[in-house]
Amino acid sequence: MQFRINIIDDEKNLNDLVRTYLEKEGYIVYSFYTYDEALMHKDDDVHLWLIDIMLDRASGFELFNEIKASRPKMPIIFMSARDQEFDRIIGLEKGSDDYITKPFNIKEVILRINNLIKRSYDDPSKIKMDGYDIDLEKRRVFNGGEEVILTT
């Protein structure tokens, strides 16, 4: 399963750089450069948002609130040039999962995203549905711990 990430940063070069590295890691990435553009996608079926705080028309904090209102469990990482302790504390108090200050090491960003994805989502090869446990990788189904024999 490929995980999908939305990025909002009005610095096009930085946005494109992060997107390129995430795509090399196997993520499907959608980039937005304006608050309004990102707001239209707040309900997208993605696994994580990477949000710059200083945007064109409104703040990343406002976008965060919009996303969390409809998707309260959505993992969100703030990234910002606002590197004062006060700014980081506000971001984390709002409920973000992480706060990365610019400039940053892209490898560190990738590792933070990888770790958050692992913590936030169960093994994608295993599904629970209507009391059944389905192991897609091994192609086996279990009901109450007992394997269900499937035939064609």
What are these regions (language model features)?
Residues 31-40, 60:
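Helix N-cap/capping motif at the beta->alpha junctions
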Residues 12-30:
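Two-component/phosphorelay signaling modules centered on CheY-like receiver
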Residues 11, 59, 65, 69-128:
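Basic, amphipathic DNA-recognition helix from helix-turn-helix-like DNA-binding domains
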Residues 8-9, 32, 49, 100:
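Conserved sequence signature across two-component system core domains
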Residues 52, 80, 151:
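Conserved phosphate-coupling serine/threonine residues in phosphotransfer and NTP-handling enzymes
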Residues 45-51, 55:
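Active-site beta3 strand of CheY-like receiver
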Residues 2, 45-47, 71-75:
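His-Asp phosphorelay/catalytic-motif detector in bacterial-type signaling
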Residues 4, 114-152:
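Short, Lys/Arg-enriched segments at the junction into DNA-binding effector domains
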